[in-house]
Amino acid sequence: MKRMKKRRLLSLLLAAVMAAGLAGCVPGQIANLLLSAGSRTAQDKLSETAEQKTDQPDETAQPSAPQAAEPAPLPAAATLPGLLGELPVLYDETLTPSVPAFTVESDFSNVINAGDMDYWPQEARDKLLQNGFLVVPGTGDEFFSRYEMNRYGYIPNFITVDSSLHTYHLYFLYLQKQTERNELGPALLELSRTMQQTAQAQLDALAGTEWENAARRTLAFFTVGLCLQDPAAAVPEAVAEPVAAELALIEAADTTAASPVMNLGGDPAAALMEDYTQYIPRSYYAGEESLERYFRAMMWYGRLTFRAADEDASRSALLACLALQTAGGARETWERLYAVTSFFAGASDDACFADYAPVIEQAYGGWPEAAALPQQPDAFAAYTAALAELAPGAVNSMPVFEWEDRDAATAGFRFMGQRFTLDAAVFQQLIYRDVEQAADGSRRMLPEALDLPAALGSDTALAILNEQGEDKYPNYGEQMETVRAQLDSAPAATWTASLYAAWLDTLRPLLQPKGEGWPQYMQTEAWAKRSLASFLGSWAELKHDTALYAKQVYGEMGGGPIDAEDDRGYVEAEPAVFGKLAALCQATAEGLDALGLLSEADAENLGRLYTLNEQLMTIAEKELRGELPTDEEFELIRSYGGQLEHFWTQTVQDEEAGIYTPQQMPAALVADIATDPNGTVRQVGTGVGTIYVLVEVDGSIRLASGTVFDFYQLDVPSSERMTDQDWWALLSGYEQGEDGQYHSTRPDQPAWTDAYTGALY
């Protein structure tokens, strides 16, 4: 099992390079090739080569990239926009940090604005002196508010990567939401309607044959998808009962059960199980009826599998592909939906039309007529035999019993499969069954959020995990080293497969150790842990924004003259993060433009966000070289809050409701990362904290402040998956305790954040 998992992830990583090579990627441009499962045969050949190279006596050898192989031709559905081109490197990769050290007096007497700390408790002052910085959790609703307060209070700003990453999240979410409202939702509804009509014609043609049950299943499948978006849609009498039962389970969204539609006419002992709690609308979908309907329909099309091991389900998959191919305009609509969603979130982890189409054409010598299928048993046998050769997905998102062969139980066709993501693939290899049962009988059923930064090379994250006792699982360390090696040797194209992948890549510099020459506070263990919170906070926003698509393991700028008081601020010295974020803004604009989805206003705002991050990168590089920013650059730092507020206003304004306040639309959010089939879901959440940092500007030490992510991890019952609204209520709520006093319901942050957090009252 371990070798299979290793081979599977390598296959997907190598696919990125192969697809990028076929696309002829040009720097700064969107490629014309979508990373798709359509080349799985070639991927398997490549991964087998990699496996042979790694199956050597030297167990410590890193996986090697195979020699170039001639890729298999891709079907038309795979040649769609989707891969980002090679992103430009905007930051100075040769920069050697040389920030001069400075000493802070124990009474802060050489800090020019020490009076700002007069009300601080001694414990907070001590931690600030020890680490050079302090984070106070739960101090705001939005990231820009603190910066605007600082501007009017003549307090030096500390510009964090957290605040800039959060601003990209706001625009990513806004763009995706607008695309779903205006294009994807209507397109999916029309596609479902077309597919239902075609499936009905197939059932009429196959009545009385051994294909009749499969045709009923296909009709029921698309009827459910249609009804989830249009509750008034007609339900054919032939499938009324299973469709009604399925819709009731989806509406209740409170259990795991056998799917009435997918198991139609099948063996109850081998029933396909579905986790219906996944249909609780979450992220930004909750609260808007049209988006909630789109959420449920896409969840249905993304999660349900026509299993390859089930012959009758494979008939249904063939009929679905045949309907997609032959119904007027259906294939083009599907390709458009797949291309746009893949640009945001990545390619399907499971086999889809792009995989099945060439198999069907090869077995049948072209596209067969539905009515002729019962008379072609040899072709069907060739088709099912070829399906057995398709690689399963890297991530299991289905309830599977432990005695089942996971690959056999999950491999098959998904109409609009949920997407492969590196984080989910990492988590899959670090939970039971890939990680063995501990001596005390416990099983690692859910991953830790820290598994991801640890797998990406963070020794700080790995040390925390071991301190928590994760190494009690016999082969957890071995699995972690395997995943680390895979990711360390992953080709560059892995990180440009989608906006999701590029966002994750933008966060990686936060995990790099900061040694001599970096600002003193960045050299501390406490800062390494704070950077983990920055990484995880932005990653939580990424998971939140792609909750539907990513596959889960199981204003006013201010004015007035500048006062003579020295309020010059500082930019967090992470030029690589700011540079990568600028490149990501550029790739977002170019990709949307290539897809015909970029308005003039959005192009302008993405351009502004690109320029802002490029300027912050330049300032951070100057700081690391020991150079003084210009007066114009200090003014940029000073006015930073107004710029953030502009982007916030652009993304949360509503034509009907008007413009919200930060209290109505806070930055805090919550997202699922994994589900334990025994009834628990692990969620990650964010909040907004204030960071205070002692920095030196032009020879004087000052206390600068800014905003950072608060990070939370918690487990809840699957039937109670939290929405953002639930999370906001939890963060701001109070409940009466047994002592009769009211206490905050805000959960505790992980214990490792104690190293850098404190309270001011």
Where are these regions (language model features)?
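Bacterial N-terminal signal peptides that target proteins for export
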Residues: 2-12
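N-terminal, intrinsically disordered, polar/charged segments of Gram-positive cell-envelope systems
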Residues: 30-79
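Long, non-catalytic protein-protein interaction scaffolds
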Residues: 62-761
